[in-house]
Amino acid sequence: ASSGLSDMTGYPDGPPTEIRFSMDIISGYTTFVAVMAALVSRQGTGKGQYIDFSSRESISILLGDALMDYALNGRVQTRNGNDDAVMVPHNCYRCQGEDNWVSIAIDNDSEWRSLCKAIGNPEWTNDNRFALQISRHKHHEELDHLVESWTINFSHYQVMEILQAAGVAAVASLNPQDLFTDPHIQERQSFIVMNNPEAGERFSVASPPWKLSETPCSIYRDAPVFGEHTKYVCCELLDLSIEEVQKLIEEGVLQ
């Protein structure tokens, strides 16, 4: 909330909306960049340094143009749901099937004409109110309903394929199950199947989202279970006897 992201998220007539995933993930990736920058500096100077990291600031930078708009124009952007200040149509549209959606974004009049052609030029696409982008913005709510009257007849994947083939920005909104079965994600091996004594034999974890051509990343083992390396650390690294370690375990000091 203190990053400003919640205040920007939601619909104009609704309250600020909390993002449903943990921001710690973004903070972790941002910290990784800071660590790498410090290591590069150490290679050149031979000196290490402390990193003063702010989780809040790592999220605030996601606001992008909203921060720039205020810095340059003194204008505070407000919540606008899925609407965009420039692109229209710009929304998530219901598709065939239960809770299936597709995101469509039209950036200019040329893309609008491509969309109209791709969906068969139904009568409403010839309405003068939708001919120009500035006019489409004024009537965007009605336009959204009309676009959805077409998307509802197809699956989200079908809509994506039809519109992308016409050069229109469209992508199926995927749920967690879709992510695991998506052909593109499978081809990239975005999820790796691991074996874990607690999670089971087919426990999938996300692989790094970057692919290096010369030194590819790999996940070679599952995460350790709680206490898995207690005896190794205490005996091999701290030089305690197995009897001492066992006593500490019995006393509840270790596990």
Regions found by a protein language model. Give the residues of each.
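A glycine-rich dinucleotide-binding beta-alpha-beta segment and adjacent secondary-structure elements
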Residues: 165-220
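Aromatic-enriched alpha-helical interface/lid elements that frame and gate functional surfaces
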Residues: 89-166, 170
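Short linear loop/turn motifs
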Residues: 126-138, 174-183, 243-255
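Flexible, small-/acidic-enriched active-site or ligand-binding loops
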Residues: 131, 199-247
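Beta-strand segments within the central parallel beta-sheet cores of soluble alpha/beta enzyme folds
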Residues: 48-56, 162, 245-249
